[in-house]
């Protein structure tokens, strides 16, 4: 287990007296890996520094936004200049349109863009807009896909092909959950069956462009294109959640690597998309984009209401514009190469330690799934069936060696343009011991 960190421990003790679980987002509590969460006090490039002064190579990258590395000079310069002009105006600002124009240039399917503050807000608005535009009530989501913490999309999967879901969180009413159909991911037959049973009342299908919250799961060949075809045939909308993958997996997000690619074997296009994380460069910003005729259903032009005091905040807009301006094709090529290097080294270390595993990949995002080499991970059941118990000792070995991983096996690993040779070598050096720790993990009773 990780060595003593007294300042972090004291901060966590205090935080637990003031905040539920001592955190403002559950994964930060280290609940699935155990031990004391790290309280970070600074970040620069590829490194984080915690309250005890320990330095870590960062493979979380703020869950994606730190694409260029932490505290990138150009982003800081833009933010400082924006702060000097004022923090919030309650009015429109030039950079709102500047950022929207960048999104539209990179993702032409986003013909209109609405800025919001969080990914949850973006998906919430997308669902409301889809219902308002179609006049229908039901939404299909996939088990294991995460779209923020809005009530209707926290529904858990039921049994059967198109079972109306039960609430997946206390506080979500059965009536709300009943408007969500939860289906197995990568199963077009289940989608077809759901539309056969409920098609006249299905407003939308929402899916992550490539799921990364049950570990990374690659969409099967033709899956996203199939969703586009089925929704179009039935007059429903396809909402593609790129909050995590957008501008992280590539210049035009995961859609740009697949359905929107010039050489796409089966081109497809969403009706609505949601963006977050990278789009704000580390500031709280997200966006909804899509077909002009649908987006124009939003107020003030249309009957679907959405508003936000801090939507399009000038400091956040400045951070987003600066980040995307420096997120060039060369940056993505560099991160892609680093991702391949790291995943290969990870797999090699686990092989050497005799740990069965598979590496799950979507663009430059990847994760490890223990005990899955024979079948891989294609859906939520596969993800849940892995040898989760091996991750905690692996995580803490890496942490002790100065490498900060996602504190859950069900999260993606992130790299940045700041992960230079020194940072990579530190990670490589830590992998063999961590792999041995995973190999020697105690198997829980009953497995």
Curated annotation (Swiss-Prot):
Its EC number is 5.4.3.8. The modification N6-(pyridoxal phosphate)lysine is found at residue 277. The gene is hemL. It comes from the Bacteria. InterPro entries: 4pyrrol_synth_GluAld_NH2Trfase, Aminotrans_3, PyrdxlP-dep_Trfase, PyrdxlP-dep_Trfase_major, PyrdxlP-dep_Trfase_small. Homodimer. It catalyses: (S)-4-amino-5-oxopentanoate = 5-aminolevulinate. Pfam families: Aminotran_3 (PF00202). Disulfide bonds: none annotated. The keyword Cytoplasm applies. This is Glutamate-1-semialdehyde 2,1-aminomutase.
């Amino acid at each position: 287990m990780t060595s003593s960190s007294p300042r972090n421990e004291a901060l966590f003790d205090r935080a637990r007296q003031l905040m539920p679980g001592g955190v403002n987002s559950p994964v930060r509590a280290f609940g699935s890996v155990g031990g004391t969460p790290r309280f970070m006090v600074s970040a620069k490039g590829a490194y984080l520094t915690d309250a005890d002064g320990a330095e870590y190579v960062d493979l979380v990258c703020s869950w994606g936004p730190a694409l260029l590395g932490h505290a990138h000079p150009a982003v800081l310069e833009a933010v400082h200049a924006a702060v000097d002009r004022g923090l919030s105006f309650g009015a429109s600002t030039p950079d709102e349109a500047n950022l929207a124009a960048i999104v539209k240039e990179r993702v032409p399917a986003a013909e209109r863009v609405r800025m919001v503050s969080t990914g949850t807000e973006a998906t919430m608005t997308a669902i409301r807009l889809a219902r308002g535009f179609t006049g229908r009530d039901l939404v299909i989501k996939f088990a294991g896909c995460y779209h923020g913490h809005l009530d209707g999309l926290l529904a858990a999967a039921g049994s059967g092909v198109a079972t109306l879901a039960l609430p997946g969180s206390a506080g979500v009413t059965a009536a709300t959950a009943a408007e969500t159909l939860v289906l197995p991911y990568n199963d077009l037959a289940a989608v077809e069956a759901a539309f056969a049973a409920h098609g006249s009342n299905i407003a939308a299908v929402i899916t992550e462009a490539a799921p990364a919250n049950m570990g990374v799961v690659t969409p099967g060949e033709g899956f996203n294109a199939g969703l586009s075809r089925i929704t179009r045939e039935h007059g429903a909308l396809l909402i593609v959640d790129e909050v995590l993958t957008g501008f992280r997996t590539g210049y035009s997000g995961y859609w740009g690597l697949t359905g929107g690619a010039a050489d796409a074997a089966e081109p497809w296009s969403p009706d609505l998309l949601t963006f977050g994380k990278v789009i704000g460069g580390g500031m709280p910003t997200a966006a909804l984009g899509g077909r002009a005729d649908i987006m124009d259903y939003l107020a003030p032009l249309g009957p679907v209401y959405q508003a936000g005091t801090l939507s399009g905040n000038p400091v956040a807009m400045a951070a987003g514009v600066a980040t995307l301006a420096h997120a060039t094709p060369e940056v993505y090529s560099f991160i892609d190469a680093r991702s391949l290097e790291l995943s290969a080294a990870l797999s090699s270390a686990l092989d050497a330690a005799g740990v069965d595993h598979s590496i799950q990949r979507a663009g430059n995002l990847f994760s490890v799934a223990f005990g899955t080499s024979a079948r891989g991970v294609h859906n939520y059941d596969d993800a849940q069936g892995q040898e989760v118990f091996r991750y905690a000792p692996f995580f803490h070995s890496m942490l002790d060696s100065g490498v900060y991983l996602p504190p859950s096996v069900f999260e993606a690993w992130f790299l940045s343009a700041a992960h230079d040779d020194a940072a990579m070598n530190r990670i490589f050096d830590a992998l063999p011991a961590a792999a041995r720790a995973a190999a020697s993990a105690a198997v829980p009773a009953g497995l």
